[in-house]
Amino acid sequence: MTSENGAVLAGSASALRADGRLLTKVGAWPVLVVWHEGRAYAVEDRCPHMGFPLHRGTCEAGLLTCHWHHARFDLASGSTLDRWADDTRPFDVAIRDDEVWVSPRASGDEVTRLQRRLREGLEDGLSLVIAKAVLGLIDAGAEPAARRISWPGGRS
């Protein structure tokens, strides 16, 4: 069931609390809803490093760790703690009565994020991060090398 604002009914809050996790789909995205330390969080159920399902991972101290390559993600923001992995997409969660509703979160400027990831990948020599950033920029209609990237220390 989808609400007027695009939120998707993921399941019951009692099931989420009992099982610790729910899986749903919001638009084209598979979504993992996690009950952790008394609160519900939702992130894309695909590790951005290699695409494996995050629902097989572990949660500890507000972090979700991918079961396969151990990439770590902050449950609240989806931000990675590992430079070689990308951030995962976070979703907003609302619990009303005994229903868990999940909706897409405004993600900000995707092109700016991808340009930042390209710069970080180049700085750290991470070819996977570079490739994913370039492909993302092309998909977003941006030219990856169309403008000069400002580098720390004044080099460009």
Enumerate the language-model features and the residues they cover:
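Short cysteine/histidine-rich metal-coordination sites, predominantly Zn2+-binding motifs
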Residues: 61-67, 80-89
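Mature, well-folded catalytic/scaffold domains that follow N-terminal targeting or propeptide regions
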Residues: 102-156
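A residue-identity detector for tryptophan
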Residues: 29, 35, 68, 84, ...
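N-terminal pre-ligand scaffold of iron-sulfur
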Residues: 1-61, 75, 89-113
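M16/MPP (pitrilysin/insulinase) zinc-metallopeptidase core fold and M16-derived inactive scaffolds
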Residues: 73-79
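Short cysteine clusters
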Residues: 47, 66-69
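Short, exposed beta-strand "edge-strand" segments with a Pro/Gly-rich flavor and a Y/T-containing core
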Residues: 5-11, 70, 84, 137-141
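Short C-terminal domain-edge/linker segments immediately following a structured domain
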Residues: 64-65, 76, 95-98, 122-125, ...
